[in-house]
Each structure stands twice: as C-alpha cells, then as structure tokens.
Amino acid sequence: MAWATLLLPLLNLYTGSVASYELTQLPSVSVSPGQTARITCSGDVLGENYADWYQQKPGQAPELVIYEDSERYPGIPERFSGSTSGNTTTLTISRVLTEDEADYYCLSGDEDNPS
C-alpha cells in the first residue's frame, strides 16, 4: 500500500510597512512505508530567519514538529529532522510510517514579523 501525503500549496504572506515574505512548497510528496520523505520549502526569508515545520492530520490542529531549522519538538520521533541551507529548508522523515500521513507546513519569520 502506497503512503502519500498531500501538501497543500503553501503561500504564506506577511505584509508590513517594510517587507513582504513568501514561502513556497511543492504540492505533494508520495513515498511508501519504510522509505525516506523529503519535503522542501523555499523563500528569501529563510536566508535570514529560522524555519519551523508543522504537521496537521485530518480533523486536528497543527502540531509543531521542528523549530529553529533543526530542533525537534519534545515527543517528536528522531525519524523527523530538519535542515536549512541558503533559502531552502527541508523536513526529512526517515523510515516513514503510515501514521506520518499528514499535511506539513513550513513557516518562517522573525519574532515580530512571522510569515
């Protein structure tokens, strides 16, 4: 049975008096259980600010998975990892389980101006 995750096209905008930030993700990533999933997100703001990753399962609120580029939130399995290089951040899920099926969102911005 194939495992698929649907990533809604993400367009996060912050409009202020000084700047406008935009982050983009691919629409979807599909892998089989046991494989490695890599989900990328890109945007100019990532070169200057941390990236956070959220997981949202159907009917549930989003939950923080990775913060400050690569820090795992307490209780998140070690299979989840994050990295950022230049203007691209990547969420990697190793040894994917069917329970990992969800929407994943990247967010970034400084403390005063999140995007």
From Swiss-Prot:
Location (main, coarse): secreted
Annotated S-S bridges: 41-106
Assembly and interaction partners: Immunoglobulins are composed of two identical heavy chains and two identical light chains; disulfide-linked.
Framework-3: region residues: 71-106
SUPFAM superfamilies: Immunoglobulin
InterPro entries in UniProt: Ig-like_dom, Ig-like_dom_sf, Ig-like_fold, Ig_sub, Ig_V-set, IgV_Light_Chain
Source organism of the structure: Homo sapiens
PANTHER family: IMMUNOGLOBULIN LIGHT CHAIN
UniProt keyword list: Adaptive immunity, Cell membrane, Disulfide bond, Glycoprotein, Immunity, Immunoglobulin, Immunoglobulin domain, Membrane, Secreted, Signal
Region (Complementarity-determining-2) location: 68-70
Any Gene Ontology biological process: immune response
Segment forming the signal sequence: 1-20
Record-level GO cellular component terms: extracellular region; immunoglobulin complex; plasma membrane
Glycosylation sites recorded in the entry for this protein: 87
Protein known as: Immunoglobulin lambda variable 3-22
Region annotation (Framework-1) ranges: 20-41
Compartments where found: Secreted; Cell membrane
